[in-house]
Amino acid sequence: MSTDSLRTSVASYREQFDELDDMIAAQMDRWSIPVLRVAIAVVFIWFGALKVFGISPAGELVASTVYIVDPATFVPILGIWEVVIGICLLYRPLIRLGIFLLFLQLPGTFLPIVLLPEVVFTSFPYGLTVEGQYIIKNLVIIGAALGIGGTVRDE
């Protein structure tokens, strides 16, 4: 095979790869936000329902960080709030409301880092307990909410 022939073959494969890459990227662009909305909605509905029914593994952690309201009242109300967030994310006209409620709720999820560091860290600042990992994963939810919120006018 000559050098020119090899270059032509490589260029042809590169063009085919670029076409395939463009098609895949277009599908990812089309589906990423709807799938993200559903995924985050499922998380909020599921985790919220667990709080409402008193079977959330995070219920005790939430109860330990609430000093103003009776935890027996607050945890189920928080669960309802989370279910509402999830439902809002599933129903397009309510996405803005869901994002708003989410951003009101999320700062509270980081309170144990300040109020209960012994529960969050095995060794500060890197060694996280399971509870700490549960809290830090909320950074992903914040990023997802920003992505969803950034496209709300496009839908």
Regions found by a protein language model. Give the residues of each.
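Membrane-interface extramembranous regions
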Residues: 2-155
